[in-house]
Amino acid sequence: MNNTQIVLSSESLNVQSCIDWIMSPESGGIDVFIGTVRNATKGKPVLKLDFEAYEPMAISEMEKIAQQAFEKWPVQKVLIHHRTGTLQVGEVPVIIAVSAAHRDAAFEACRYIIDTLKQTVPIWKKEAFEDGEVWVAAHP
Amino acid sequence: MNNTQIVLSSESLNVQSCIDWIMSPESGGIDVFIGTVRNATKGKPVLKLDFEAYEPMAISEMEKIAQQAFEKWPVQKVLIHHRTGTLQVGEVPVIIAVSAAHRDAAFEACRYIIDTLKQTVPIWKKEAFEDGEVWVAAHP
Amino acid sequence: MKINVLAFGVAKEIFGSSLVSLELTNDATIYNLKYLLEQQYPRLKQLASYMVAVNNEYALPGDTIHERDEIAIIPPVSGG
Amino acid sequence: MKINVLAFGVAKEIFGSSLVSLELTNDATIYNLKYLLEQQYPRLKQLASYMVAVNNEYALPGDTIHERDEIAIIPPVSGG
């Protein structure tokens, strides 16, 4: 579908190329969510993050979420880019971009996509601290 | 304040430089709203838009909105860039960017800022159609 | 006192100018100013609404106008 | 039948491998698979939760497993 762009990549994500792809003369509002690797979790310094994905299923689940966004809101284009591999503090694990004729739909769909991605897409993040590594959310 | 960047400019807005400014190692989520000039209003082709601002008051009102965002949500940086002058279809009249440790605050503050900007900041837009020009929202 | 009133957007077209001068009494309020302007430029009353700003702040109808205040007519805004 | 189970994230560490092989009866369900795995790898029960995917789709406990299905253990996801 040329109104959807899903990418799972071990290379740096490029915000500008996402913006270039999402903009169109039909759209009036674009909402972009950019996740970044924070330097601390609950006050504890983070050294780096490792992202692992079950790649074919992750792409399939991201496509489902994009499809749901089109069903729920009058949006024009949906972009989801996610990184894999090792990311340093300040790097970008995820970019979501949504264009729509009106901003309500763009904001709501963008929010829905990142919230749902964090619940359903098989990607796992391991945080490296000075005293060891932890798979995020694995244990109660 | 070095956590706030307000710009009113007759030059093209640059999304990448906004992203570069808003990103920081403390932030985990960034929400960016980009307004674009749509090629039609209620099905009628739009040729161009002219933006006029009461500049000192527009800047002062944008600063107030940024300040309110800091009071209402735990956000780290707020950026508001707005164009003046003549814009063609596809050009960008406004960019709002908000960074926060967590995405909830970034999304809610970004939405609040664009909604409030459209209600209070003294900037006016004139739409040029094939059969004439109209100041948007001027008349009931 | 003589005051200058800045006009923007559609108000500039209604006034035929980006600045008009008015003679007001010394204790004049925003309400008085709007009444005078609407007498002189009846098309103002056809606007969806309009506000008056004094020194870059939105003013209330009861606010008093002082000499040298920067007064501006703010028709419905439509930025963003 | 013999099936291969893919493991990701913390499950890979619990299994000590990204792929383990199991012998299942022909009418085995996801429920049966989880029971067997938890017998063999008790640390699975310490996870906040985990799902099983069959051919890239989340499966329900009652779903039957077929030979050649691609089975994967999905510990709590944490992307984004």
Task: Describe each region flagged by the PLM.
Chain C
Residues M1-S78:
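Ubiquitin-like/PB1-type beta-grasp interaction modules and other compact soluble beta-rich domains
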